């Protein structure tokens, strides 16, 4: 899955 926990990925923020 596409996880992203840093502010640059706010549009698809997923932790």
Swiss-Prot record:
<dbReference type="GO" id="GO:0005576">
    <property type="term" value="C:extracellular region"/>
</dbReference>
<keyword id="KW-0027">Amidation</keyword>
<keyword id="KW-0964">Secreted</keyword>
<protein>
    <recommendedName>
        <fullName>Alpha-conotoxin-like MIA</fullName>
    </recommendedName>
</protein>
<dbReference type="GO" id="GO:0099106">
    <property type="term" value="F:ion channel regulator activity"/>
</dbReference>
<keyword id="KW-0872">Ion channel impairing toxin</keyword>
<comment type="function">
    <text>Alpha-conotoxins act on postsynaptic membranes, they bind to the nicotinic acetylcholine receptors (nAChR) and thus inhibit them.</text>
</comment>
<keyword id="KW-0800">Toxin</keyword>
<feature type="disulfide bond">
    <location>
        <begin position="4"/>
        <end position="9"/>
    </location>
</feature>
<keyword id="KW-1015">Disulfide bond</keyword>
<keyword id="KW-0629">Postsynaptic neurotoxin</keyword>
<feature type="modified residue" description="Cysteine amide">
    <location>
        <position position="15"/>
    </location>
</feature>
<keyword id="KW-0528">Neurotoxin</keyword>
<feature type="disulfide bond">
    <location>
        <begin position="5"/>
        <end position="15"/>
    </location>
</feature>
<dbReference type="GO" id="GO:0035792">
    <property type="term" value="C:host cell postsynaptic membrane"/>
</dbReference>
<dbReference type="GO" id="GO:0090729">
    <property type="term" value="F:toxin activity"/>
</dbReference>
<keyword id="KW-0008">Acetylcholine receptor inhibiting toxin</keyword>
<comment type="similarity">
    <text>Belongs to the conotoxin A superfamily.</text>
</comment>
<dbReference type="GO" id="GO:0030550">
    <property type="term" value="F:acetylcholine receptor inhibitor activity"/>
</dbReference>
